[in-house]
Structures are given as structure tokens and as C-alpha cells.
């Protein structure tokens, strides 16, 4: 199966300082790829390069088997962007926000209703964005991204500042898109989120990829259990693997109002990240 996206030895610098150095990664159809890193590690720069918003200084970017030194219209049409809720128009309704992009991509109006229904905002089609909650805005951003049925969607910290219930809703949307064969490239600060959703992850540190691979393999490398512990209202504790399959079970518990709390191995995973950062610093000495 050909990769949707292939990045080889990508390089970018600002003021003669490398912010991305020898970046290599690939994404297959239906894959969820997670990019993690501390502030200033280059996550935003990388996603801006991959979406054609800024130029690279070196290396190759290949979409659908063709090298893209310049982004053609077919590449832009193949990608959906859900990067910043501030790009939504507060004074316009949900429907009007999507109508603008329907015109740009020459999409039938029926697709607007389909996209709103997909993200469970069909009853808010006439609601102004300024009246939406953070979770609803994020879902509208995803609706806009899928409007033209792209092959790959870029998400920038899609659950940042969201409560657990809204986070779960976004996770379900991401997994649903994956099941349809859509590739997802997402940045996140949440290690447990990356472990739960992603097929592969990369940790950026000091302008380079310090860790890359399957989340389970990384857990094994650092001797992590990667478990979820679900505390139910009846006092029962359910232990699950922290992966996409467990999302279905958790969704059922939430739907039945049974969950009191969810505990993950996030603190342990943060230790992994810190050890990677420390490793990078020791290599500089």
C-alpha cells in the first residue's frame, strides 16, 4: 500500500538556526500519526510545512507517490485542515462557516448538512459560532476539514482545554474517520492520547525526531503497562489496555452514565518524554 505522505530528510532553519533537522516519516491511508514535543520543538513549523503554509529549506515531501516541491491544487484538495478554532467566523452560523468552504472547494450544499450531522452539530446549524462551547467549536472545525472528503486531515492539538466528555467525542470522531480510510496527522501534548489513538508516534526534541514508532513498542521499550483504570459508580474497577479498541467499551460506559473516573498511565508516559528530553540534552554535551 502506497504512503499518502512521505517525508525524507526535511530541513528548516530560521536565522541560521535549525528548527527541523533530518525529519523522516511516512503515513499510510487510514493511519493516525501523532506528533509530540515540548514548546519550541518544531511541531507547528512541521505541520505548516506539510500543509504548504511555509517553505522547507531542504529534503523531500512526497504526496501520493509524487514529489511536491510546489503544492499543486490537487494536493490542497486532498488535505483537510483543523488547526485553529480562531479561524472560524464567530459572527456567522455553523452552516454559514461551512458554506464559505463549500464554495471554495465547489462542494454541493448537501455536503454541509452531511458534515454537520457527522459531528453531531446538525441541530446547531443556525447557531452562531460565538455561542458554541469549546468542544462544539472543535467539532465544527473538523466538519469544515472533512467537507470536501480529503484523504488526510491535519489536527493541531484537537482536545486542548477540553473536558473528558468532549475529549471522548473528539476521539470517537477521529477513530470514525480512520475507519473510513482517512489518514490523520495530529499534534498533541497528551502522551496518553497519542498512545490511545495513534498507530505511530514521533517525539520531537531539539529539532530532531528523538523517538519514532508504534506506541506499544515504545511502551515496551520503557517498561510501561499503558493501562486504563475505569472507576464505576458502583465501586467496580475495570482495567483496560489504553488503546483504540478500549474506546468502544468506554463509550458504552459513558452512554450508560456508569463512569465515576478514568485513570491512565499518563504520569508514567510523561516520564518517558522527560527521559527522551534528558537524553537529547546529554547528547549535546
Question: What are these language model-derived features?
Answer:
Residues 99, 103, 109-124:
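Conserved ABC ATPase "signature" region
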Residues 212-213:
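ABC ATPase "signature
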Residues 153-157:
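Catalytic Walker B motif of ABC-type/P-loop ATPase nucleotide-binding domains
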Residues 217-285:
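Short, charged/small-residue-rich alpha-helical element at the C-terminal edge
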Residues 59-70, 74-75:
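Conserved ABC transporter NBD signature motif
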Amino acid at each position: 500500500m502506497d504512503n499518502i505522505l512521505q517525508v525524507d530528510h526535511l530541513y528548516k532553519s530560521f536565522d541560521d538556526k535549525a528548527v527541523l533537522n533530518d525529519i523522516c516519516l511516512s503515513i499510510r491511508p487510514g493511519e493516525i500519526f501523532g506528533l509530540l514535543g515540548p514548546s519550541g520543538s518544531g511541531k507547528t513549523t512541521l505541520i505548516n510545512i506539510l500543509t504548504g503554509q511555509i517553505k522547507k529549506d531542504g529534503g523531500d515531501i512526497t504526496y501520493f507517490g509524487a514529489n511536491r516541491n510546489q503544492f499543486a491544487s490537487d494536493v490542497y484538495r486532498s488535505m483537510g485542515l483543523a488547526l485553529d478554532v480562531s479561524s472560524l467566523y464567530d459572527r456567522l452560523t455553523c452552516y454559514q462557516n461551512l458554506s464559505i468552504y463549500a464554495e471554495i472547494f465547489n462542494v454541493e450544499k448537501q455536503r454541509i448538512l452531511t458534515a454537520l450531522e457527522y459531528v453531531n452539530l446538525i441541530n446547531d446549524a443556525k447557531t452562531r459560532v460565538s455561542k458554541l462551547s469549546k468542544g462544539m467549536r472543535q467539532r465544527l472545525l473538523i466538519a469544515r476539514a472533512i467537507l470536501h472528503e480529503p484523504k488526510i486531515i491535519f489536527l493541531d492539538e484537537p482536545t486542548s482545554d477540553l473536558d473528558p466528555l468532549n475529549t471522548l467525542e473528539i476521539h470517537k470522531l477521529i477513530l470514525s474517520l480512520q475507519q473510513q480510510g482517512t489518514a490523520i496527522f495530529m499534534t498533541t501534548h497528551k502522551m496518553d492520547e497519542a498512545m490511545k489513538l495513534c498507530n505511530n508516534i514521533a517525539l520531537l526534541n531539539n529539532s530532531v525526531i528523538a523517538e519514532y514508532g508504534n506506541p506499544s513498542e515504545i511502551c515496551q521499550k520503557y517498561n510501561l503497562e499503558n493501562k486504563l483504570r475505569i472507576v464505576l459508580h458502583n465501586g467496580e474497577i475495570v482495567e483496560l489496555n489504553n488503546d483504540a479498541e478500549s474506546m468502544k467499551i468506554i463509550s458504552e460506559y459513558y452512554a450508560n452514565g456508569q463512569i465515576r473516573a478514568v485513570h491512565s498511565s499518563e504520569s508514567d508516559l510523561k516520564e518517558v518524554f522527560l527521559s527522551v528530553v534528558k537524553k537529547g540534552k546529554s547528547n549535546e554535551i
